[in-house]
Amino acid sequence: MSLKITWLGHAAFLLQTETLRVLLDPYRAPDVGTYLPIDTPADVVLVSHLNPKYHSYWEAAVGNPMRLNGLDLSMMPEGIEAHGVRFRAVQVWESPARDVPVSMPYFTLDGVSVCHSGDLGHGLTADEVEPIKGVDVFLAVTGGSPTVPVLDLKAAIDLIRPKIVIPMHYQNGKINLSLRPVDDLLALFDPAQIDHHPSSELEVSPSTLPAETRVVVLPSAR
């Protein structure tokens, strides 16, 4: 068994096991730039917060999936179980002022734990890190302002100690936001820790996880 992770573009990912398809933070094309429409079947759509343009376009999923909002989950200590998976979230904030709540959803599929950093806009405290410490895969919002500054992101990664970091939410010529490129984050890592994957899909299983943190850069599928 393995978990297939596809970076669709911006903050959107499709996570697939043999029996389940989870869509994370789908955007609304063409309103976000030149990213193509997502239009993919899903069993669950999980969003970090409500922002239909960039993070919560429910209609990007084909079919009749369950809809989960990470902000709701963050208010439930046990989260919600759906399709045999326990979905939880940590409440964080969209800016250093900590005035607009967002969330970082986390869950485990096929033995691989995953956390999506949503629209995180600040450095993380030890209490905020605790529920996701040691997560296998961290989907990291990387483009800097208006989201978390890259130095604060690196500090958070050092606290979380994920096995794999997959950058997202950065400027790659497709998004119509003023974001920084992924190279700003990569410059803070040893080049030996960085993999530029040729495909937008990455297959991960508990037996293939690296011993130490690696950054895996995926091209967008859309």
What are these regions (language model features)?
Residues W93-I160, L177:
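Active-site-proximal loop/helix segments of hydrolase catalytic cores
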Residues W7, Y57-V90, A155-M168, A187, ...:
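P-loop/Walker A phosphate-binding loop and immediately adjacent motor/lid segment at beta-alpha junctions
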Residues A12-P77, R88-V100, L120-P131:
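Pre-active-site segment of Zn-dependent metallo-hydrolases
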Residues M1-E18, G70-L73, G79, V90, ...:
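Zn-dependent metallo-beta-lactamase
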Residues T6-L8, D99, I164-R222:
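Binuclear metal-ion centers of metallo-dependent hydrolases, dominated by the metallo-beta-lactamase
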Residues K4-W7, R21-D25, G84-W93, M104-Y106, ...:
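Active-site-proximal beta-strand elements of phosphoester/diester hydrolases
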Residues A42-D43, D136, K163:
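Conserved acidic residues
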